[in-house]
């Protein structure tokens, strides 16, 4: 019985201690945070919750203040110096915005396209302009022209009397070449007078080859005498 009573007293004292501690923490939340108990007071609980942006609009790791500071520098960089070469003159403009420069370039391109689509000149005028440009494009020194004309070879004009002689000479050469070709094709052919003695010598050296045509006619007179 004594042990049961002592247990009830201990549990009641522990419950009282916990209730006192909770009251103290609620009243003094900052002090409890310093103690490191991990319990926040009523003031911390009433603070608004901060949300984390998973898809930020400004890329990069810099803060918004840094981004705001960079914008005027970018605007200053857009304004630069512009130089224009027109009509043999140089025009310089300081702090010229980039947007106006783009507009100016578009206007210049449009004007160049309209100039190309202008009315064409007549053929005679274009021919004269082309001739003038060709002459002016390659200027020749005045001192070199007479020397070049003097040293230029004069064309040879053939005389009418020399033409028949040249034709005869060419014909004679053609006939000589043709004769040489014929001799080269048949080198062993000769005249018929040269071939006749050769045939006679062959017939005399080989009489047996010509027995048929060279057989003499029989002498009938001798046979008649013997028969008598």
Swiss-Prot record:
Residues 175-228 are annotated as: Disordered. A motif (Jas) lies at residues 164-189. GO terms for cellular component: nucleus. Its main location: nucleus. Induction: By jasmonate, wounding, and cold, drought and salt stresses. Down-regulated by abscisic acid (ABA). InterPro entries: CCT_CS (IPR018467), TIFY/JAZ (IPR040390), Tify_dom (IPR010399). It is found in: Nucleus. This is Protein TIFY 10a.
């Amino acid at each position: 019985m004594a042990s049961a009573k002592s247990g009830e007293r201990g549990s009641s004292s522990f419950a009282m201690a916990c209730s006192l501690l909770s009251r103290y923490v609620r009243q003094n939340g900052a002090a409890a945070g310093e103690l490191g108990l991990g319990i926040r007071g009523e003031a911390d609980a009433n603070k608004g919750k901060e949300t984390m942006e998973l898809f930020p609009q400004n890329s990069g790791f810099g803060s918004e203040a840094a981004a705001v500071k960079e914008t005027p520098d970018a605007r200053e960089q857009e304004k630069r110096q512009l130089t224009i070469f027109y009509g043999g003159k140089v025009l310089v403009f300081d702090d010229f915005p980039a947007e106006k420069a783009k507009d100016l370039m578009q206007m210049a391109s449009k004007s160049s396209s309209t100039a190309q689509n202008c009315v064409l000149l007549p053929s005679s005028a274009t021919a004269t302009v082309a001739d003038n440009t060709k002459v002016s494009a390659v200027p020749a020194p005045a001192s070199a022209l007479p020397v070049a004309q003097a040293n230029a070879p004069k064309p040879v004009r053939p005389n009418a009397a020399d033409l028949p002689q040249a034709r005869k000479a060419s014909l004679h050469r053609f006939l000589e070449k043709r004769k040489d070709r014929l001799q080269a094709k048949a080198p062993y052919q000769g005249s018929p007078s040269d071939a006749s003695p050769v045939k006679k010598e062959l017939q005399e050296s080989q009489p047996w080859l010509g027995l048929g045509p060279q057989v003499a006619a029989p002498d009938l007179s001798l046979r008649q005498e013997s028969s008598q």
